[in-house]
């Protein structure tokens, strides 16, 4: 394609960020990606992909990409917190996956983001060891990630003084 990649500047309460976007005008391509589970306005309806679409060996890569977009890792002097926002169904599946890949028990508790009837929840886990277990699952031996969040993982991994 010859369509030029344009860069935009987003200004929000989180700060200023550069971003690019892609416009897809091919009906065939749109139908193909819909068959792979890509949907419009995913925020309130996204479910974890079925194994016929996403093989289990790629779960951590999917979750890492999702975390890069809709998650956070907060490292402060007194606390560590891992958080992902999404639909209740998606988050419950992610909790199951974390429990299958870790020695720690991640309670199957999802919290409402806002006091309304929308399917918008979050999960949150704290403590160095529990958080590090999740982050190692997501990032170890990976080379595609959001650099800003990867650097926080490395900071947590190399942290000797934080014992929460």
Segments predicted by a language model, with ranges:
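Internal intein/HINT superfamily modules and their associated LAGLIDADG
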Residues: 1-164
């Amino acid at each position: 394609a010859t369509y030029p990649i344009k860069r935009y500047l987003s200004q929000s309460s989180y700060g200023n960020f550069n971003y690019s976007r892609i416009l897809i005008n091919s009906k065939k391509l749109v139908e193909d990606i819909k068959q792979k589970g890509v949907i419009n306005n995913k925020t309130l309806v996204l479910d974890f992909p079925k194994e016929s679409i996403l093989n289990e060996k790629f779960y951590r890569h999917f979750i890492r990409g999702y975390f890069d977009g809709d998650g956070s890792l907060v490292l402060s002097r007194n606390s560590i917190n891992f958080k992902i926002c999404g639909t209740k169904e998606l988050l419950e599946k992610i909790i199951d996956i974390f429990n299958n890949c870790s020695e720690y028990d991640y309670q199957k508790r999802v919290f409402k983001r806002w006091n309304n009837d929308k399917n918008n929840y979050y999960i949150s886990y704290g403590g160095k060891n529990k958080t590090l277990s999740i982050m190692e699952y997501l990032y170890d031996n990976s080379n595609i990630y959001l650099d800003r969040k990867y650097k926080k993982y490395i900071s947590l991994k190399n942290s000797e003084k934080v014992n929460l």
